[in-house]
UniProtKB/Swiss-Prot annotation:
PROSITE patterns assigned to the protein according to its UniProt record, in alphabetical order: ADENYLOSUCCIN_SYN_1, ADENYLOSUCCIN_SYN_2
Record organism: Plasmodium falciparum
Co-factor remark: Binds 1 Mg(2+) ion per subunit.
Record-given protein name: Adenylosuccinate synthetase
Taxonomic lineage: Eukaryota, Sar, Alveolata, Apicomplexa, Aconoidasida
Gene giving rise to this polypeptide: Adss
Remarks, miscellaneous: Parasitic protozoa lack the de novo purine biosynthesis pathway and rely exclusively on the salvage pathway for their purine nucleotide requirements.
């Protein structure tokens, strides 16, 4: 489905499209991003680091991407890593090598993105182990994301642009590592080995490190088609998510502007990716969680194990109040509903349409969401029940080919969100995507 060339006749929204996760991540953003990357000129990441990830299949070959945007798989596409990211350069180089080809020639790295060092990962593990002993673990990926954003916020981090002048980088590196070793009582760390690696990165990457703000805005002025790829998802946002069980970056639409340096009026279309049920990895409130056979059914049939960590994901029913809250923040124009096929075989499907205060019976106000753990404990879900379907829907190519009960479920979600569901994922492969042809875009 090609937004950029307006194959949907009643969509003419411009050249800049953002694909954002609308839940706790793992919504299946990779498929729609991959589909649209083929038609874009530039694909961008604006936030996070190697804590995100998806597996993409192109020409029967699978690629596991954690830092690079999906556009790297297409020779006509330029890939950009924005200033809002934290980049573990060793992981980036390994990923570049795994993709192969002349990828470096079409990759641009922001000079303002921060470098994530191995010591950040060590600190992440130290902090998480301490929290585990205290019973307060967050459930991080231990990829060093939080500690790197911490050094950024503390104004002692090192930006990629520094790597262009290696002598300057070496001095800043020594000061940072010595400070962190002292602060966290780390007695052994091979600085010389890491510095040698970074000298090689300096040689290979110095011409790829640019002022991405200027680069992006010049390309926008030239009407290039830009696809912006969100990492993680809205409910993991550092400000708007279920704090403190969140990631360390801005995962919502505001992060697009601060993480790439583009003007908010340049963004034309926001696509929210929504899984047909709900999952989350790690700790934190989950009001529709299913700790029963249905939850296990969803986990196994949906292969709900983390791309990055391989941890089993917690599973539950779709949460409409959450999506309304996320829609308010992100101004979502369209929805890609994923993994509808996983619901096939269930006798009954529940849809959370509101939350009720356990004591007062008062319903949650529209657009609000109990993101704080202590407040969420005061609420219980209000469900609408739907009959399930037994049919295998993976061969469905049109909306009208879906079982009636599946269509009722989709239309109910649209009704509550007042947002068109344009793409419907009905299987694991790229071809297993229904595109609804008739919808209204407000």
């Amino acid at each position: 489905m090609n937004i950029f060339d307006h194959q949907i006749k009643n969509v003419d929204k411009g050249n800049v499209v953002a694909i954002l996760g609308a839940q706790w991540g793992d919504e299946g953003k990779g498929k729609i991003i991959d589909m649209l990357s083929e038609y874009s000129d530039i694909t961008c990441r604006f936030n996070g680091g190697a804590n995100a990830g998806h597996t993409i299949s192109v020409n029967d070959k699978k690629y596991a991407l954690h830092l690079l945007p999906c556009g790297v798989l297409y020779d006509n596409n330029i890939s950009v890593l924005g200033n809002g990211m934290v980049i573990h350069v060793k992981s980036l180089m390994e990923e570049i090598e795994s993709v192969g080809g002349k990828l470096l020639d079409r990759l641009y790295l922001s000079n303002k993105a921060h470098i994530l060092f191995d010591i950040h990962q060590i600190i992440d593990s130290i902090q998480e182990t301490k929290k585990l002993k205290e019973g307060k673990q967050i459930g991080t990926t231990k990829r060093g994301i939080g500690p790197c954003y911490s050094t950024k916020a503390s104004r002692i981090g090192i930006r990629l642009g520094t790597l262009k002048n290696f002598e300057n980088f070496k001095n800043m590196y020594s000061k940072l590592i010595d400070h962190l070793m002292d602060l966290y009582n780390i007695t052994e760390y091979d600085k010389e080995k890491e510095l040698n690696l970074f000298y090689n990165y300096h040689i290979k990457l110095r011409d790829r490190i640019v002022d991405v703000i200027s680069f992006m805005n010049t390309n926008l002025e030239n009407n290039k088609k830009v696809l912006i790829e969100g990492a993680n998802a809205a409910m993991l946002d550092i400000d708007f998510g279920t704090y403190p069980y969140v990631t360390s970056s801005c995962t919502t639409v505001g992060g697009v502007f601060s993480g790439l340096g583009i003007h908010h009026k340049k963004l034309n279309l926001v696509v929210g990716v929504v899984k047909s049920y709900l999952t989350r990895v790690g700790c934190g409130p989950f009001l529709t969680e299913l700790n029963n056979d249905v939850g296990q059914y969803l986990r196994e049939k949906g292969h709900e194990y983390g791309t990055t960590t391989k941890r089993p994901r917690r599973c539950g029913w779709l949460d409409i109040p959450m999506l309304l809250y996320v829609k308010c923040i992100n101004s979502i124009d369209m929805i890609n509903l994923t993994k509808l096929d996983v619901l096939s075989g269930l006798e009954e499907i529940l849809l959370c349409v509101n939350f009720k205060n356990k004591k007062t019976g008062e319903l949650l106000e529209k657009g609000c969401y109990p993101v704080e753990e202590e407040i969420s404990e005061e609420y219980e879900p209000v469900y609408e029940k739907f009959s399930g379907w037994k049919e295998d829907i993976s061969t469905c190519n049109e909306f009208d080919e879906l079982p009636e009960n599946a269509k009722k479920y989709i239309l109910a979600i649209e009704k509550y969100l007042k947002t068109p569901i344009v793409w419907i994922g009905v299987g694991p492969n790229r071809k297993n995507m229904i595109v609804k042809k008739n919808f209204n875009l407000n």
